[in-house]
Amino acid sequence: LQRVPIWLANGEERLGIAFHPKSSWLTERDYQPPDLPLMIGVVRGKNYLHASIRQPWLVFHELVHGYDWLVLGKQQKYGIDAGLYERAMKSGKYVSALHWDSRYRKPYHAANRMELFAETSEAFFGTNDIYPFVRAELRAHDPKLFRELASLWNVDLDGQRRSSRALAKTLESSPLISGLEEAAKGSDESAAPAYAPTRRYARCNIEGWNVLIGPELEKSPKLAEKARRLLRRDLHYVKRYVPAEAVKKLKRTKIWLEKDNPDVPYLTFHASDKHLASRGDNVDKAGAVEIGNAENYLRWFGREPSIILHMLAYAYLQSEIDGGNDDLATALSRARKSGRYDKVLRFDGQRVRHPALANQYEFFAELSETYFGTNDHYPFIRGELKEADGKTCKIISRLWTSK
């Protein structure tokens, strides 16, 4: 994919973003591209910025076309097998599909074999704006095409399954929010401290957030840099999707980045200093997000791409909505009674009870992921939430003061 150059131009309104296997197509129409045989053209930046809000994997879509031409077709043609497209169309699975705006219409997959490959690759690796939106849905919707994509992209599905099982096991055994009970009722128990003092942490500003990096992680500079880079990406998306006034409040939440805290094998939001004291941890982490294991944070990004937003939603609910309100309680009660969240598709293809049903914190955080980003459980994106539970969708929007 890195062999495909990207041309960022300015002001040309006639052309959006597209892969051009031959630059002559551009020059013949009086464009002035760089002297390259092929490229992705992003000709009008404003349009690209607008389109990428609902199509966050838009550039990847065009890179897939580049991969199709360069690798599969060996720079002579688009190489994706026509038979793959014909089988998919004959199956009847791509006649009508839910789109990002909660409306059903003919999906772009049906346009031709190149678009089928690009659209389904978006879902395979990221988030598409047309159903199937994510990998789990693609696997359930069209398992044959799913396997063909894995082969075309040389993906180790067995390794992916092992990683997914490890994440599912970690989520079941290690809560993403810690200290809720202690925050509610208080506790005077404490254990002997066994942690590096705050003064030993390196501090940096990432997208406006105060980030503290543990001394052990600092000893692994490559890992630390990868974690910072991913965190920058995650926080950038929070800023891009969440309303500006709410972002200002979210930036008050510190983020602690550790190499390997055995008490936090993934991520957590520390709701109580009492809970931290009871296990001998640093009470300065109270009210903050902790990425307790940098390796796991990097490892599981593809399955939980909005996990940082999830963490920050806990902080927002605690500080701005007093841990919940009547609207949220009503929505949660209605969701529990409806049964629609009792057995939903999860990132690993399993059907499980939605973690949103646990309490108001989980309900708000999970569905904020869905509303602004991509969840790891159905409903995966806002369009599905709006279709499945429109009342809750409006409540989540209102709590974030979103338009």
Give the role of each language-model region.
Residues S24-P37, V43, I53, Y85-K169, ...:
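Metalloprotease/metallohydrolase-associated module, dominated by Zn2+-dependent proteases
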Residues P107-H109, A202-R203, E245-K248, H354-P355:
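A general structural signal for short secondary-structure junctions and capping/turn motifs
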Residues D188-R203:
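Short acidic, Pro/Gly- and aromatic-enriched capping/linker segments at domain boundaries
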Residues L212-K219:
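Terminal transmembrane helix and immediately flanking juxtamembrane interfaces
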